[in-house]
């Protein structure tokens, strides 16, 4: 190997077997939310030296993730690097120390990365029965989500699997500030069994489970606080929320919600734990609807029946 300042020529082969990363040091250096687990690895790399460029092909295999690189070109003159990559994570939950949340499933992604004055990275993956294509420029992340299954996403993040739908979304997020926004289009949404839909079916004869909803979901993200709105519509019904407050750290929700089934409108409030929020119905509005009047008729009949029983006992 010749090693002149700008006239490198040769080949370097690197082999590491049964290596162990210094998890304690890395956790402190990168200020991970929780300690990085013990990570063992094997590394095989081959670097071709030509001029002022070192071109590396590498395979990194560990108990957390595997990374394959076909060509990582490092330019000695300006310290820039340009590389492809393929990332495989068999268990996303092992990345809790980075993601700060539990996630089910696995991940395979590929893309390119370059670092000179700026950092640029592309990311492509099949996730939750759909596709995600993202671009990172320094701290700015832009992502396009295509045909992702809502039910699969809810399952991944340990949220209640209340509905399934096809989602398309655009995400704009600043990693340094932990702030951003999301705009999503929902198609063919269907809901699982719940008490609210059961009551609507009982008093309005509208089967909300047979309805297929389409519409929009938007959200503004500020660290763990999310401010969202939902507007879903079907042939016979609609579901709307505005200023929905979610906290991903405490797992809490606080929102007003309006459900309409034909001419019947039910307004209420969801508050508490996302997994099992309390539901408070606006009875005044509900009683003015056709369904409310039917409930009132049934209640009156029950009261009348009980009064008649009482009078029969008295006389």
Question: Where are the regions that the model predicts?
Answer:
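Extended terminal
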Residues: 35-63, 74-76, 106, 112-118, ...
């Amino acid at each position: 190997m010749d090693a002149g300042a700008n006239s490198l020529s040769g080949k370097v082969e690197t082999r590491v077997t049964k290596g162990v990363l210094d998890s304690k040091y890395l956790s402190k250096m990168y200020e991970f939310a929780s300690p990085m687990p013990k990570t063992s690895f094997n590394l095989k790399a081959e670097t071709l030296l030509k001029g002022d460029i070192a071109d590396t092909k590498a395979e990194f295999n560990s108990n957390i993730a595997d990374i394959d690189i076909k060509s990582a070109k490092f330019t000695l003159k300006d310290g820039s690097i340009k590389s492809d990559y393929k990332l495989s994570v068999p268990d996303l939950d092992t990345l809790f120390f980075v993601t700060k949340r539990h996630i089910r499933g696995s991940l395979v992604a590929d893309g390119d990365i370059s670092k000179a004055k700026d950092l640029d990275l592309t990311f492509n993956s099949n996730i939750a029965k759909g596709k995600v294509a993202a671009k990172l420029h320094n701290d700015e992340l832009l992502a396009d989500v295509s045909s992702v299954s809502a039910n699969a996403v809810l399952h991944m993040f340990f949220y209640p699997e209340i509905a399934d739908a096809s989602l398309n979304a655009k995400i704009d997020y600043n990693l340094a500030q932990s702030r951003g926004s999301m705009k999503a289009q929902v198609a063919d949404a269907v809901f699982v069994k719940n008490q609210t839909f059961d009551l609507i079916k009982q008093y309005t004869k509208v089967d909300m489970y047979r309805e297929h909803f389409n519409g929009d979901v938007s959200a503004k993200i500020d660290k763990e606080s999310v401010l969202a709105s939902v507007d879903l519509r079907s042939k016979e019904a609609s579901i709307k929320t505005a200023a929905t407050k979610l906290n991903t750290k405490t797992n809490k929700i606080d929102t007003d919600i309006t459900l309409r089934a034909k001419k019947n409108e039910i307004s209420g409030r969801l508050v508490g734990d996302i997994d099992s929020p309390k539901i408070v119905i606006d009875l005044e509005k509900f009683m003015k609807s056709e369904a409310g009047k039917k409930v009132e008729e049934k209640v009156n009949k029950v009261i009348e029946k009980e009064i008649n029983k009482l009078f029969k006992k008295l006389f």
